[in-house]
Design a protein with these regions (language model features):
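N-terminal membrane-anchoring alpha-helices
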Residues: 1-35
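Alpha/beta-hydrolase
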Residues: 13-18, 40-52, 56-59, 239-360
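Conserved HGGG/HGGXW glycine-rich cap/lid loop of the alpha/beta-hydrolase fold
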Residues: 135-187, 447
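Alpha/beta-hydrolase active-site loop
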Residues: 193-211
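C-terminal subdomain of alpha/beta-hydrolase-fold enzymes, centered on the catalytic histidine
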Residues: 301-456
Length: 456
């Protein structure tokens, strides 16, 4: 047993050394055209236009009419959220949405920060741009792009923005925040051509930062945002000074990873596993296979026929809310599925949850947001970006209730300049919205380390 293990580790070390000696590669991307019809000839319109979220009485009346006409269907007895969104609690959500939720007030809240649009590669890109109100003499704001995922939106960052642009400690870094909407999400125009994946989004977001005058900047993301920001770093390693993510799913399974799966439970220290790593990874079949199948049904639908399922969600606000909010329950804490209310109001307010739903509803973006899965997965799992390491300074905030867990030893196989890996005290998938203070502190710690090392 021990001889076999030693031999396997020796082979793994040789493979790793050969891999690391390869010349550093940069991900390649080409300009695309995602607008309607043929590519526009001539220079691209690079104007930046102020934008405001708006609503009308007709829009609100249409919503109320649809809420009034919803058809309820009873959940099974004693099923809680194990079959999906519990119908009894959904009735409470719909009642609050219809009678108490003030969309006009939430629109004003959305507009508390400046919004803009600019056209890149044929489509309008929406983003929120927040500059610090004041800066101490001799200091500068550090540009940071924060990218959301599905089924979130730029609104996820409204709680963390003031913590980063107006830090309470004079020792903290003051940030200038840019929060774009992924094309096809919220108020960014949806691509009109097939093939728009994470690399394409990353290429556009790097262009956006350059258009805003930033030659170097930091990026942060969770869910799809982690893929997009990772791709941004792979595309422009000289522009992206640092990458911070709070979602680091396991990468391509190499020999060392396979060995750690086979022997890590018995020899955790040999593979750098902590007690939490062992708890999240083993037994392997249950944690890495069964749990994944149980929670990824939506992914199979959206990766194959997004337009079919999306049509019903685009027509029914109640269906849309159930589909989105069920993820805010289970992905925040898997144990919440055993609660009648899904634990939703333990971590979030209904106003915040419904505001995120309303961004999808009013922008009619649920179908185009779901297509992003098909565009990424239909190209296969062996894409260049999946095989290419990240060479820019990176930081990972590992939240205990995240959907998928990657031990530090796995993360370093992808992110070769990992500066921080923080096991967080609490929190799940929607970290910026659920635990803005914890995430802000980790971003601060990471950027301070990178900035300090840059000065040496």
């Amino acid at each position: 047993m021990y001889k076999e293990l030693a031999l396997a580790l020796g082979l793994g070390t040789v493979v790793a050394l050969v891999f690391l000696k390869k010349r550093k590669s940069v991900l390649k991307a080409h300009d695309g055209w995602w607008g309607v019809g043929a590519c526009h000839q001539g220079p691209e319109d690079d104007s930046i236009r102020p934008f405001k979220v708006e609503t009308t009485s007709e829009e609100i009346e249409d919503l109320h009419r649809r809420l009034d006409q919803t058809r309820s269907f009873p959940s099974l007895e004693d099923s809680q959220f194990n079959y999906g969104f519990n119908s009894k609690y959904l009735e409470k959500v719909v009642s609050y949405w219809r009678n108490d939720f003030n969309w006009r007030k939430q629109v004003d809240k959305l507009n508390k920060y400046p919004h803009f649009k600019t056209k890149i590669e044929g489509i309008d890109i929406h983003y929120v741009h927040v500059k610090p109100k004041s800066l101490a003499e001799g200091t500068r704001a550090v540009p940071l792009m924060m990218v959301h995922g599905w089924p979130g939106s730029f609104y996820e960052f409204y709680g963390i923005i003031p913590l980063l642009t107006e830090p309470s400690s004079p020792d903290d870094i003051t940030f200038e925040i840019i929060c774009p909407s992924i094309p096809g999400y919220g108020f960014s125009e949806a691509p009109h051509k097939k093939g728009f994946d994470g690399v394409c989004a990353a290429h556009i977001f790097n262009k956006l930062m350059k258009r805003l005058g930033f030659n170097q900047y930091y990026v942060q993301g969770g869910d799809w945002g982690s893929l997009i920001t990772t791709n941004m770093a792979q595309l422009e390693p000289n522009a992206v000074k640092g990458l911070h993510i709070n979602f680091a799913p396991p990468g391509k399974a190499g020999l060392l990873m396979m060995l750690s799966i086979l022997f890590g439970r018995r020899f955790p220290k040999l593979f750098g596993f902590t007690e939490h790593d062992v708890k999240r990874l083993f037994p392997t079949m249950e944690k890495l296979v069964v749990d994944a199948i149980r929670e990824t049904g939506y992914m199979h639908i959206q990766s194959t026929k997004p337009d079919t399922a999306g049509r019903g969600l685009n027509d029914s606000p109640v269906g849309l809310a159930a589909y989105i909010l069920e993820k805010f329950s289970t992905w925040t804490d898997p144990e919440f599925k055993n609660l009648e209310d899904g634990g939703l109001e333990r971590k979030f307010s209904l106003d915040d949850l419904l505001t995120n739903v309303m961004i999808y509803w009013t922008s009619k973006s649920i179908i185009s947001s779901m297509r992003f899965y098909k565009e990424n997965f239909s190209k296969g799992l062996n894409q260049p970006h999946a095989k290419l390491p990240v060479y820019v300074p990176s930081g990972v905030a590992s939240f205990p209730n995240e959907l998928m867990h990657s031990p530090k030893s796995w993360v370093t196989q992808k992110y070769h300049k990992l500066k921080t890996y923080t096991p967080m005290a609490r929190g799940g998938h929607f970290a910026a919205m659920e635990e803005p203070q914890l995430l802000a502190e980790d971003v601060q710690s990471f950027v301070k380390i990178v900035e300090k090392r840059k000065k040496k």
